């Protein structure tokens, strides 16, 4: 291969300089860049760009219990499952710990529905359940009984709630702030004539 040695050395030097500058920037970021983002900043960003936050899949607040059809006291479990009383919910959780094959009972937090959908019979329709008066369905199939309650439900394409987007927005703001910081840093270094061999980095 015919390679111009001078051109090759120039490229190597440029590559080394790029690595040195990158390492220098990373160390300054580690030492000086503030990664904190206030909750107000996150809320303001969400409210300002709310139309951009569309759900890519269905989400829900609810409960799912999968239990063997031969599990004890199923009638009591169903009674507890339908209840919103705190003591009943605690009792339901205790039951699930002992007998449920799988369960999810945190109906105060949004969760993605796809993992649930993959575990329930095809006859259980989220749309039908959610728009029904009782908002739950109980289905026996094969060796198991499936109990599904949908307290709240949002479909793909709807506006995503703040709790789902909070961490994404925080990281987005951090990355934007980091880019601004790096641009400011680069401008200062250029002004000081320091983007050269003047920068001593001890690796």
Model-derived regions: residue spans:
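Peptidyl-prolyl cis-trans isomerase
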Residues: 1-203
């Amino acid at each position: 291969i015919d390679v111009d040695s001078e051109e090759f050395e120039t490229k190597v030097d440029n590559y080394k300089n790029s690595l040195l500058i990158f390492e220098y920037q990373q160390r300054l970021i580690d030492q000086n860049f503030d990664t904190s983002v206030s909750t107000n900043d996150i809320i303001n960003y969400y409210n300002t760009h709310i139309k951009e936050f569309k759900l890519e899949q269905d989400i829900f607040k609810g409960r799912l219990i999968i239990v063997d059809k031969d599990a004890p006291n199923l009638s009591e479990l169903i009674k507890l499952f339908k209840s919103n009383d705190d003591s009943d919910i605690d009792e339901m959780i205790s039951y699930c710990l002992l007998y449920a094959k799988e369960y999810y009972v945190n109906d105060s937090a949004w969760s993605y529905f796809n993992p649930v959908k993959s575990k329930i019979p095809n006859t259980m329709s989220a749309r039908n359940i959610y728009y029904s008066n009782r908002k739950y369905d109980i289905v026996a199939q094969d060796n198991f009984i499936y109990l599904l309650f949908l307290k709240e439900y949002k479909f793909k394409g709807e506006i995503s709630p703040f709790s789902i987007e909070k961490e994404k927005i925080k990281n987005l703001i951090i990355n934007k702030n980091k880019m601004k910081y790096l641009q400011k840093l680069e401008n200062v270094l250029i002004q000081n004539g320091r983007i050269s061999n003047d920068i001593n980095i001890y690796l």
